């Protein structure tokens, strides 16, 4: 009975949104083929979080826009680095992913050995889950619309084709290195 209420659905949205967003990110990488998977997505989210907490505590970052830009920028930079290693150094994606996982777990523990930190005042209400309509739902809706728009692009078609048959994709003139980097 509690789940089928405004508060129940509000709490559900808060709990599942990070998982849905991580799934969107992982799906593109898996679609790239060659047994690609990103084992480090959890530690990467943790890394972004622990560094953000340190930056907030030091007063170096406070604006909601700056926080979102920081989180997205660090995520993109990490994924580009991993993609460049996979594409140009030619290390298997699972090895690169596992190395990133282990590195980030260690770095996260060094940065913050135990849970601590502050939540910005503007974000305090986000975790209450007392209503269905929250900023977390807005983020989920924007991400879902972005996913559907991206699925209509030529890049997405090339990504599906590359995941199905990389050699045929290459012979049809698609720059598979660029598509793989874009997938990350």
Per-range role (PLM):
Residues 60-101, 144:
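Alpha-helical transmembrane segments within multi-pass membrane transporters and channels
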Residues 46-50, 75, 101-102, 143, ...:
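Residue-level recognition of pore/gate-forming positions within transmembrane alpha-helices
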Residues 89, 93-153, 179-182:
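Transmembrane helix-bundle core of multi-pass membrane transporters
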Residues 28, 54, 59, 80, ...:
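Membrane-interface helix caps of multi-pass small-molecule transporters
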Residues 3-14, 60-66, 124-136:
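Interfacial loop-to-helix junctions that mark the boundaries of transmembrane helices
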Residues 65, 78-81, 131-184:
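Helix-loop-helix "hairpin" substructures at the membrane interface of multi-pass membrane proteins
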Residues 18-19, 47-50, 99-109, 171-173:
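Small-residue-rich segments of transmembrane alpha-helices in multi-pass membrane proteins
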Residues 6-59:
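Single transmembrane alpha-helix segments in multi-pass membrane proteins
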């Amino acid at each position: 009975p509690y789940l089928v209420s405004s508060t129940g659905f509000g709490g559900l949205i808060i709990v599942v949104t990070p998982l849905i967003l991580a799934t969107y990110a992982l799906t593109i990488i898996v679609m790239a083929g060659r047994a690609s998977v990103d084992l480090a997505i959890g530690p990467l989210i943790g890394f972004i979080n622990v560094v953000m907490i340190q930056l907030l505590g030091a007063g170096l970052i406070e604006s909601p826009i700056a926080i979102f830009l920081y989180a997205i920028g660090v995520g993109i930079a990490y994924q580009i680095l991993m993609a460049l290693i996979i594409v140009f150094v030619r290390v298997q994606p699972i090895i690169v992913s596992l190395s990133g996982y282990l590195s980030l777990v260690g770095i996260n523990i060094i940065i913050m050995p135990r849970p601590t930190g502050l939540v910005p005042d503007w974000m305090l209400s986000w975790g209450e889950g007392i209503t269905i309509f929250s900023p977390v739902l807005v983020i989920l809706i924007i991400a879902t619309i972005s996913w559907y728009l991206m699925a209509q692009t030529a890049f997405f078609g090339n990504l599906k084709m590359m995941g199905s048959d990389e050699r045929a994709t290459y012979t049809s003139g698609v720059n598979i290195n660029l598509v793989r980097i874009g997938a990350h």
